[in-house]
Amino acid sequence: MYFTTLQRLYSKGHLRGLVRSLLKQIIVKCGGVPYLLANDSHPDIVYIGVDRSRDVFGDSPSLSAGVAAVAPNGEYLGADTTNLDKYTDDFIDISSILPSIITQVKQKRPGVKIIVLLRDGGKYNISEHEVTSAIKITKEANLDLVFLSANKSSGFRAFIKKDSEIKGFSCPVAFYELPNDPEDFLIFSTLPKQGTQTPILYSILANTSSYSNNEIKQLVSNDLTSLCSLVWEAPSPTNLPLPLHYADKLAGFCKTIQHPWASEIETPLFI
């Protein structure tokens, strides 16, 4: 399942972490939600994944955008869908979907202060109007916003050397800033049992919180790596973070049935 040495596997503390990770995955595979096993280190932050699904071969647009919200510990907080423009990947109007998901989030997490929006796609494919609309909506809800582009197609597996050998890298998660653009950063795991998640490339398109961009990078690097371990469809540690995984499943499902998400479904099982 994981490529590692027996010496590392049975080293002090490593076996405990491996069992803890596998226990979460076993619970997910059996249909449970193991968020109670995770540390809720940031109760004031919620992650919202945004993804889209397109059918370019159909006569009708048949396009859907899925939005799913989870807490940093993996607790499911809500989901919704909207339509996309037939000729573009951008949303027709993001204001038609964010308010409803924020309402669901506030009902379950009244102490939320920061929304971290994970938008699938490269930063150059996301319209400025979408970013400004998201800022306006969260401001009206008295929330701060961190808007991140996250291109799923940029994933690959990689392992990092020991923490002491790479300047600025912290164990077990590390972020690496790209020299061409300080708002772009990669997320790596320094633990072989985790591998590298998908996607690894993120870009900060907006940050209205009191955190600096560097603090945001470290915070989301830790949280997103943890959220990857809560997805278990195949024996691979290169999964999407939970909110993007949920949004991807939701968008594809609603595109297929050509019908919006049913609000009566309170807790779906996206596996």
Pin down the residues of each PLM region.
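Long, contiguous domain-sized segments
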Residues: 1-271
